[in-house]
């Protein structure tokens, strides 16, 4: 940072950088709670507590966050913040860097309406600060109860909120959306009339991931052929960190042929623990002529910076930038989502 941040800004920036670095959520929450508590104080109150050495008397402020606040109030950039800034993100190849620069938005993100950690406004403002022109808000559908999926009524209320925020945040745009579960029979887990109102529909498999390949193939193809489906999310469902999770098995030639036939995009899910689809499958999708959407699946503001990871995977697979739907401006993207299934 070229200027010294105030205590609230420093705490919020640390939380953001911890999110980017995949820190445990409790660590992130500690800094965000401290930032909220400090923001609620009058400047004179905060200075008095600092001068008397009583910063830890502020609710949600412990020894670590008190040190951050003290350094910021003393006119210093907190040492922990400098350390996190120096870590930075992964270096990108030239091709991946060029692709990252071409992206205009992100078509897969979550808020605290489902299993994300931040309000819609905070996610949108973080996306705008990264230079995005738009962010698709794609909270989960009702069947995924573990992720607090939105039933029809909650989704309607969220649409109203997005309308309000778009009026305030213009020209930045929050695109209405959903990450809708692909049910066992290939149908989508939300009411048809609501799906038709959304800007972006990401369809993903979250259950019965160990289905036999023929059944999984039929399930996925049926979902892809649904005219509401715009993007096929994290198609194998694999997890490549920790205990991991093996990828689902399906016939990629049939699945990607269905995507090409319907104009549905294959998502490159940039989450470090997913990096889905694997490179060999992504190359098959490229060979089939599929559109691609490079998304973060962000559940917190700092995770919106993960797009570069997906761009690196796209570069390795030889993805043609003209096929990347979130390299388009919002109007072109919405024209595509409105027409590609017809």
Please give the residue ranges for each predicted region.
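Active-site catalytic microenvironments in core metabolic enzymes, especially phosphate/sugar-handling
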Residues: 177-180, 309
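Positively charged, glycine-rich low-complexity segments
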Residues: 117
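Short strand->helix junction
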Residues: 112-114, 299-300
